[in-house]
Regions:
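Active-site and donor-binding regions of nucleotide-sugar-utilizing enzymes
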Residues: 1-10, 32-33, 45-123
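Non-catalytic terminal and connector segments of soluble metabolic enzymes
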Residues: 11-14, 39, 43
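Short internal beta-strands
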Residues: 15-23
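N-terminal beta-loop-helix "entrance" segment that forms/cooperates
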Residues: 22-40
Length: 123
């Protein structure tokens, strides 16, 4: 979902960076994902996310890692895409640091509160 945005940034030589949180840790959701979408490897890879079993634990590791990157890079805008815990952590980290947040896929709803993603969409 962010691949077209990344391609356009690259085409226009706009400064940007990609953070891979490791939330999806199978080979089909990692290196293959970047290859299939014709994306270069991400500049940043967080570790330890897959080691956490709970949503809270994963989100905490991502929040801490993303915050560290944002403090180092200080972008004017941080884009997130989707409804996974990665996006919740990224948006929260950026907002707490007074960095603008852009959300690709904002407004999508299922109204199924049994899904963790629905909670992330609303927050």
């Amino acid at each position: 979902m962010l691949a077209p945005v990344i391609h356009e940034f690259r085409r226009r030589s706009l400064p940007h960076f990609v953070v891979h949180t490791g939330q999806h840790y199978s080979p089909n959701m990692d290196a293959q994902f970047f290859e299939d979408l014709d994306l270069p490897p991400p500049e940043y890879r967080l570790s330890g996310v897959a080691d956490k079993r709970s949503h809270a634990g994963q989100t905490a590791v991502m929040l801490e890692g993303i915050e560290e990157i944002l403090l180092q890079r200080r972008p004017c805008l941080f884009l997130v895409g989707g409804d996974a815990n990665t996006n919740l952590a990224g948006a929260l980290a950026a907002r707490k640091l007074h960095i603008g947040v852009g959300h690709v896929e904002a407004g999508e709803r299922s109204y199924d509160w049994r899904m963790p993603e629905e909670h992330n969409r609303v927050i």
